[in-house]
Amino acid sequence: MCVATLASIRLRLLVYNIRYATGIGPAFHLPFPGAGYLRSSRKVLDGITSFVKAQDPDIVGLIEVDLGSVRSGMCNQAQHVADALGHYTTYECKYGKSSINNHMPIVRKQGNAFLAAPRVEGERFHYFDTGIKRLIIELELDDVCIFLVHLALKYRHRQYQLRYLHDLIAKSHKPVIVTGDFNTFWGTDEIYLFMRAAGLRSANEKNVPSFPARIPRIELDFVLVSKEIEITHFEVPDVRFSDHRPVLCDFNVRGAVASRTAVA
């Protein structure tokens, strides 16, 4: 018979703003500033894919993903990485259905994505009501809900978005992880009140910066967890395929319901 037991579910989460696999370095701004956003590199994408695969993550959050525009040669970068990992993927344009950006070439294919092993209950897309980047992806696993965000560049818009996010995660009946690129130019101090109000803490206890990738000075990329989640490892790997470094987090969900087979 099958007997329900309390156990710790161990998972590895990797979150990476890959900047559409456009690379880094001085050439990114030639022949004019920001020109690199118009050209993606399969070599960079393959490097990102190899790195992600080597970490053997259970869940991957990808930010600034090209979902198949002319820039990437019609390659859906989320699907490309997912296929290499043998993972399920869900992705969406980050601007919201009513945004004019949905009608612009290249831009309309800019999104965020989750990749996960096939033990997924469901995913939901939510949208902030302010800011340009509005997408929130909610990924519900058996024992935890994970929210992937890319917050606004403007401070005032970020604060509105954090208020919306607080109300959204309060509805979850499972332990919660909120992760992504928060664009917090003052680091953890900027989201301190949000974390306290939402009952979250940062997995990055030493406040290791993740941006810019070459010599990180700012903590932009976060993994925030609720009290039921135990962090067993956190790392910001020295990887330079993008202007951000990835964040890697191993965690246990304490008190998760597992099952075992007992023989009478």
Regions found by a protein language model. Name each.
Residues 127, 148-151:
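Short, structured patches in soluble enzyme cores that scaffold and shape functional sites
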Residues 12-17, 47-72, 146-149, 165-193, ...:
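Active-site beta-strand/loop signature of hydrolases that rely on acidic residues for catalysis
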Residues 69-74, 87-114, 183-248:
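Active site of divalent-metal-dependent phosphoester/diester hydrolases
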Residues 2-5, 10, 64-143, 235-238:
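Structured beta-strand-rich core segments of catalytic domains in phosphoester-bond hydrolases
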Residues 155-167:
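Alpha-helical scaffold elements lining the catalytic groove of polysaccharide deacetylases
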Residues 18, 115-118, 137-143, 226-227, ...:
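Active-site beta-strand termini and strand-to-loop segments that position acidic
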Residues 1-84, 91-99, 163, 254-264:
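N-terminal, active-site-proximal structural segment of metallo-dependent hydrolase catalytic domains
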